């Protein structure tokens, strides 16, 4: 569990420092990398939790708690910073509607943050039914944003 937490903290730190490390890239590319890296980290932590709930991989309470903790830690990263004006162009799946509806997009992200906080809290109980409900609620929060703001294919 400690290794996974350290990995997430290290990755979050690298993500936060990414703008400095890639200052040679144009802003569009830098922000796209920022967003894609962040979302990849979310998926790497949430995906195994979904798989455990669905019975696709063995239930491992210790790992599940670590994934939930790390997912909650990632909610402290300023994801919305990755969407400045002008960064909607290029190779991305972020729909232009994000920039047209920034308040709604921010509200949906706040809903995700709340869902993840609740998931993290419930994960520690070991109650599989409650965990399954919170995983579903977190998935619904992800889907609410994806349905409206994520393109199926890359936009150019």
Predicted regions mapped to residue ranges:
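N-terminal signal peptide c-region/cleavage motif recognized by signal peptidases
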Residues: 17-19
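Bacterial N-terminal signal peptides that target proteins for export
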Residues: 1-10
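Sequence context surrounding c-type heme c attachment/ligation sites in exported
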Residues: 25, 29-61, 65-156
């Amino acid at each position: 569990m400690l290794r996974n937490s350290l990995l997430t903290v290290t990755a979050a730190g690298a993500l936060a420092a990414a703008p400095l490390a890639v200052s040679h890239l144009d802003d569009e590319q830098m922000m796209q990398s920022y967003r894609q890296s962040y979302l990849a980290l979310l998926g790497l932590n949430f995906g195994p939790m979904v798989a455990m709930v669905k019975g696709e991989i063995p239930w491992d309470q210790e790992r599940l708690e670590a994934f939930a903790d790390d997912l909650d830690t990632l909610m402290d990263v300023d994801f919305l910073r990755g969407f400045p004006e002008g960064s909607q162009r290029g190779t991305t799946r972020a729909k232009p509607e994000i920039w047209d509806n920034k308040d709604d997009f921010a509200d949906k992200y706040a809903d995700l943050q709340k869902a993840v906080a609740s998931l993290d809290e419930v994960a520690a109980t070991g109650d599989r039914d409650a965990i399954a409900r919170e995983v579903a609620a977190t998935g619904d929060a992800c889907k609410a944003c994806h349905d409206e703001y994520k393109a199926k294919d890359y936009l150019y």
